[in-house]
């Protein structure tokens, strides 16, 4: 079983970070990309992938790792991390929101977002996600963190509702970080 579209964000830099992160920086760089693609191609088998690039100084050459068609949208500037961003939305939220709109404009029935540092595993993950979306409009992963946005899915109704709610938040991501 395959899906029509997987979306993700992208930012990589050789410079030290000026914000707090969890995990090894190796998962945020080009060196991790072949592993990411192997998990996405093996367990989701998308017909298309959208990468929203936050004006990253280091680019991944996606075609070196996959035969899946990739569309890339590059932001004019890096919105930054929620801890130090200067715009209303941080880079992660820009990637999520732009890819949601992209999915709606392309009439995609199943929206899947996989963060650039997340691995997907399990032959039944796509079927289980589709089944869950028959009961709910949004499906998020499970784990130790309060918020699980590394992998999530939505149907069209869920996309419209979620985008509407996100756009109604008057506080910037720096004021109220989306991770918390």
Predicted regions located by residue number:
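Acidic donor-binding/catalytic loop of UDP-sugar-dependent glycosyltransferases
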Residues: 116-130
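Short loop->beta transition adjacent to catalytic acidic/histidine clusters or analogous donor-positioning motifs
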Residues: 3, 41-50, 70
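N-proximal low-complexity "stem/linker" segments adjacent to membrane-targeting elements
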Residues: 1-35
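Catalytic core and acceptor-binding pocket of nucleotide-sugar-dependent glycosyltransferases
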Residues: 120-123, 141-145, 149-180
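Active-site-proximal specificity loops/subdomain of glycosyltransferases
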Residues: 16-22, 52-106
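Short, solvent-exposed loop/turn segments at secondary-structure junctions
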Residues: 11-15, 55-58, 78-81, 116-120, ...
């Amino acid at each position: 079983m395959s899906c029509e579209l997987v979306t993700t964000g992208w930012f990589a830099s050789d410079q030290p970070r000026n914000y707090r992160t969890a995990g090894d920086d190796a998962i945020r760089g080009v060196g991790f990309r072949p592993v990411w693609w192997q998990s996405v191609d093996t367990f989701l088998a998308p017909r298309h992938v959208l990468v929203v690039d936050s004006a990253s100084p280091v680019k991944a050459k996606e075609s070196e790792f996959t035969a899946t068609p990739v569309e890339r949208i590059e932001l004019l500037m890096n919105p930054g991390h929620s801890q130090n961003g200067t715009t209303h939305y941080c880079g992660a939220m820009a990637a999520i929101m732009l890819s949601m709109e992209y999915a709606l404009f392309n009439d995609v029935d199943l929206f899947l977002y996989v963060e650039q540092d997340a691995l997907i595993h399990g032959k039944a993950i796509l079927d289980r996600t589709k089944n869950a979306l028959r009961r709910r409009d949004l499906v998020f992963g499970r784990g130790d963190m309060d918020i699980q946005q590394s992998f999530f899915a939505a149907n069209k109704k869920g996309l419209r509702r979620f985008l509407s709610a996100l756009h109604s938040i008057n506080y910037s991501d720096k004021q109220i970080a989306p991770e918390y």
